[in-house]
Amino acid sequence: MMISEIRQELTDHIIPFWNKLRDDENGGFYGYLSYGLGLDKKADKGVILHSRILWFYSNAYMTLGGDELLDNAKHAYEFIKNNCIDYEYGGVYWMMDFEGKPADTMKHTYNIAFAIYALSSYYRASGDKEALALAYRPFEDIEKNTLYEYGYREAFDRQWRLVDNEALSENGLKADKTMNAILHLIEAYTELYKADGNEKVADRLKFQLGQMRDIVYTPDTNALKVFFDTAFNLVGDIHSYGHDIEATWLMDRACDVLGDEDLKKQFAEMDLKISHNIQDIALEDGALNNERDKNEIDKTRVWWVQAEAVVGFINAYQHSGDEKFLESAKSVWENIKEYIIDKREGGEWYSEVTFDHTPHDYKETVGPWKCPYHNGRMCMEVITRGVDI
């Protein structure tokens, strides 16, 4: 039942919505659609948004087939190849204007990771060896320009001089290093290794998994730390429920792709503990709360947190056989259907909904961070995992 509903959501709602945002005049996809569904054709175009769109169409094609999906993937690929990559200094830009010229030339490890993720997927979908070569450019740029004794630095100007990490700092905190960046480097390197089997990529992927296991994970609480200074000292007291449940299945996936049996066992045990913890403390009224900051719980229902919860709970069920995880996945999907999916003509999913089910009308429908990657990926993961309820 759930698989058929989610397949329909992908094919009849999410994909058609994003198809309409293709910009054939200036390349790429339009960068902003308001809560009121007003399209701004001259809005800046986020590079993270475009990497995620490229990943989405590439994987939708590999999951469903269909020439239109591959064509839209190619359209996103051409925009990234021709506009977003900095061929002079390396990496990718942070933001383009509506015509495809650089609007913000900051280099960020998180953003560059998504370019690797997307280009690797497009290579797998299309077989275009140029895309694989382009995926290795940002990989080498990260390895050359961001490494230091504690792993990977995150925020730089165009010429790789360090700048404040404002892009990934939140809650009034300044964080030099983030769990978020490490997680999405793991995600990106997993996809690149899956595409090409390069042992250097495998080695760096194992290094990052080790950082998550040995530094970011807290065994006493079965939670992941969020923000750090340059020496990996904790900054703030935040628990991000969505990132925890997303990390469980992404780390399991990385170990599966690496084929390392010891790592598989270590992370399966750790990730199940994290999943149980999230189920116990964050699942409320059929949906996942957002985060804890010190003693305050933010109960906002954020679109991506709900999508990752469905995948994470299904993954936990597959590793444990515990049907309570399936029940949790089902409850979150039912909540998504009822309250997160935007049923207005021309809508997709609301960005955020309050605990009592009121959409936040100040949060855009499409923007630099509001994309088809989390909800689209949820659909594809449910389809390909084949676990029905």
UniProtKB/Swiss-Prot annotation:
Effect of H243 to A/K/R: Lack of activity
Chemical reaction(s) catalysed: D-cellobiose = beta-D-glucosyl-(1->4)-D-mannopyranose
One GO MF term attached to the UniProt entry: cellobiose epimerase activity
Effect seen on changing W304F: Lack of activity
Record's subcellular location: Cytoplasm
UniProt note: pH dependence: Optimum pH is 7.5.
Enzyme class, broadest EC rank: isomerase
Temperature dependence: Optimum temperature is 30 degrees Celsius.
Effect the entry attributes to changing F114A: Strong decrease in activity
Keyword set includes Isomerase: yes
Documented EC number(s): 5.1.3.11
Effect of E246 to A/Q: Lack of activity
Major location (coarse): cytoplasm
Pfam families recorded: GlcNAc_2-epim
Example GO biological process: carbohydrate metabolic process
Regulation: Enhanced by Mg(2+) and Ca(2+) ions, ethylenediaminetetraacetic acid, ethylene glycol tetraacetic acid and citrate. Inhibited by Al(3+), Fe(3+), Co(2+), Cu(2+), Zn(2+), Pb(2+) and Ag(+) ions, iodoacetate, 4-chloromercuribenzoate and N-bromosuccinimide.
Its job: Catalyzes the reversible epimerization of cellobiose to 4-O-beta-D-glucopyranosyl-D-mannose (Glc-Man). Can also epimerize cellotriose to Glc-Glc-Man, cellotetraose to Glc-Glc-Glc-Man, and lactose to epilactose.
Protein family (similarity comment): Belongs to the cellobiose 2-epimerase family.
This protein's name: Cellobiose 2-epimerase
Organism of this sequence: Ruminococcus albus
